[in-house]
């Protein structure tokens, strides 16, 4: 199934839901998933959620990290990466010692196309149209766990763990 997905991606096409669900279902059958699993980025649409239901894949919890569009734009728009070694930076939260220069290797810092404001806004538009409705879907099932965004990954992780009782 993975090769099938790769052929779509290599052609610049969206991978059909049936292939995505097949990959997820196949992976969740592995022994290391018997006691639980975490999915990130799946499902992205109501049809995917419904297909997972039909495949018998049940979620105990669905975490929704609540964050404003403006905060997402600021965070993603501020990301930079070294063009030579790939080291990550952020203009506000993790700036390099010298602007535009990687602390690790001296390479030039660039902004990935994915992090440019127009791209982020387009992705947010798609999110609001296709993914946001999942919150209502999982809320009706009683498994939605909304969590307020925190300033750091560590703080957000802590809040999620507390919300899940871990």
Where are these regions (language model features)?
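ATP-dependent small-molecule kinase phosphotransfer cores
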Residues: 1-58, 68, 77, 81-87, ...
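A glycine- and Lys/Arg-enriched "phosphate-lid" helix/loop adjacent to the NTP-binding pocket
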Residues: 7-9, 59-129
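Generic alpha-helical segment signature
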Residues: 17, 95-98, 153
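Residue-level "edge-of-site" marker
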Residues: 21, 65, 151
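Residue-level signature of catalytic and energy-coupling elements of molecular machines
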Residues: 24, 38, 72, 127, ...
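Residues at or immediately flanking beta-strands
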Residues: 36, 62, 88, 143-146
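Conserved beta-strand segments of the P-loop GTPase G domain that flank and frequently precede/overlap
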Residues: 40, 64-66, 148
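NTP-dependent small-molecule kinase module
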Residues: 108-166
């Amino acid at each position: 199934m993975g090769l099938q997905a790769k052929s779509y991606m290599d052609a610049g096409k969206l991978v059909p839901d049936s292939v995505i669900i097949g990959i997820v279902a196949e992976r969740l059958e592995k022994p290391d998933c018997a006691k639980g699993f975490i999915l990130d980025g799946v499902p992205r649409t109501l049809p995917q959620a419904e297909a997972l239901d039909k495949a018998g894949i049940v979620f105990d919890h669905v975490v929704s990290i609540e964050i404003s569009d403006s905060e997402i734009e600021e965070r993603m728009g501020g990301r930079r990466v070294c063009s030579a070694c790939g080291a990550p930076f952020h203009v506000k939260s993790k700036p390099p010692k010298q602007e535009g220069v990687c602390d690790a290797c001296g390479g030039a810092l660039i902004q990935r196309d994915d992090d440019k404001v127009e791209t982020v806004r387009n992705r947010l538009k798609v999110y609001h149209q296709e993914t946001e409705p999942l919150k209502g879907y999982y809320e009706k099932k009683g498994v939605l766990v909304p969590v307020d965004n925190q300033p750091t990954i560590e703080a957000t992780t802590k809040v999620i763990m507390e919300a899940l009782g871990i």
